From Swiss-Prot:
Matches recorded under SMART domains: SERPIN
Name of the molecule in the record: Serpin B7
SUPFAM superfamilies linked: Serpins
Designated gene of the protein: Serpinb7
Protein family: Belongs to the serpin family. Ov-serpin subfamily.
InterPro entries referenced in this protein's UniProt entry, alphabetically: Serpin_CS, Serpin_dom, Serpin_fam, Serpin_sf, Serpin_sf_1, Serpin_sf_2
Species name: Mus musculus
Length: 380
């Protein structure tokens, strides 16, 4: 799975840096895998420069384990199919769903093989709609579909004025995750603390606290601590807490560096005194500007787009790409769990390392080597 993991990570970190720089010092949260999937869906029908721009942005030319650096897009698509099949199947330990839809004006006729590939490879919805004559009803139906696909958790991806009757093709993408910590925090241990951030100077936050064994690494360059918080079901959140500011970490984000920072040989199981703020981030991004900044210009340009492998009926291009994601981090993860042996703390603890996230930090949520989410908490 190395090539998909690497391509998804490199694309996600490129996108994170672009989104972070364009929105100032705010919180950031998105699913790179989800947006990666949406763009791969477009790649199925892209031709010429359109296809080459997508390949470059998605790092489809990353060398494989065999050292072959030629375009390995078909292999990546097969890997992605397997990952998405696992994600969208039901799991008793967590809820995770990705919903991706391609909606085009009804004058365009989707190619049958494109619909089959989109549905079979990515479980995506492909549908002809009436933007021209009934844009509000179309918006309502798309929002309702996303709401159903995410079990009612994500609503109104498309706002009241987000679509116009001149829309040609719209990609809508939403992702929802609900997990339970393996080692839940205790609510009575939550403290009120000040969060040190220029974004919200002096803000008092609910700081969760627990002391037990965690996987932790201390990185010298860039200087930071990396803490692993495990969810049930093989998913982990890795929190990157800098000694000083985040700039150096952000500039060094790469798949290889993340693998190094979270390497099992480097992360030692040790007693850690953890302080982590509760936080909730809900983001609804219109991705066009961000993706253009990564070199994906042609798919959004009526005069340049070549998406002839998707549909016939005229020159097709992407009018809008919407992405919505939501996360809430609390004591239980997201819902209370019964006590297990993981929640039993020894009475006599050895000296602990302190991990105090009372300043801005980065985090990724991943399963195995696949990054599901990337985020930045500037102000909880």
């Amino acid at each position: 799975m190395a090539s998909l993991a690497a391509a998804n990570a490199e694309f996600g970190f490129d996108l994170f840096r672009e989104m972070d720089s364009s929105q100032g010092n705010g919180n950031v949260f998105f699913s790179s895998l989800s947006i990666f999937t949406a763009l791969t869906l477009i790649r199925l029908g892209a031709r010429g420069d359109c296809a080459r721009q997508i390949d470059k942005a998605l790092h489809f030319n990353i060398p494989s384990r065999q050292g072959n650096s030629s375009n390995n897009q078909p292999g990546l698509q097969y890997q992605l199919k397997r990952v998405l099949a696992d994600i969208n199947s039901s799991h008793k330990d967590y809820e995770l769903s990705i919903a991706t839809g391609v909606f085009a004006e009804k004058v365009y006729d989707f190619h049958k093989n494109y619909i089959e590939c989109a549905e079979n490879l990515y479980n995506a919805k492909v549908e002809r709609v009436d933007f021209t004559n009934d844009v509000q009803d179309t918006r309502f139906k798309i929002n309702k579909w996303i709401e159903n696909e995410t079990h009612g958790k994500i609503k109104k991806v498309l706002g009241d004025s987000s679509l116009s009757s001149s829309a040609v093709m719209v990609l809508v993408n939403a992702v929802y995750f609900k997990g339970k910590w393996k080692s839940a925090f205790t609510k009575t241990d939550t403290l009120s603390c000040r969060f040190r951030s220029p974004t919200c100077p002096g803000k008092v936050v609910n700081m969760m606290h627990q002391e037990r064994r965690f996987n932790l690494s201390t990185i010298q360059q860039p200087p930071m601590q990396v803490l692993e918080l495990q969810y049930h079901g093989g998913i982990s959140m890795y929190i990157m807490l800098p000694e000083d500011g985040l700039c150096e970490i952000e500039s060094k984000l790469s798949f290889q560096n993340l693998m190094d920072w979270t390497n099992r040989r480097k992360m030692k199981s040790q007693y850690v005194n953890v302080f982590l703020p509760q936080f909730k981030i809900e983001k609804n991004y219109e991705m066009t500007h961000h993706l253009k900044s990564l070199g994906l210009k042609d798919i959004f340009d009526e005069s340049s787009a070549d998406l002839s492998g998707i549909a016939s009926g005229g020159r097709l291009y992407v009018s809008k790409l919407m992405h919505k994601s939501f996360i809430e981090v609390s004591e239980e993860g997201t819902e209370a769990t019964a006590a297990t042996e993981n929640n039993i703390v020894e009475k006599q603890l050895p000296e602990s390392t302190v991990f105090r996230a009372d300043r801005p930090f980065l985090f990724v949520i991943k399963k195995n080597d696949i990054i599901l989410f990337t985020g930045k908490v500037s102000c909880p």
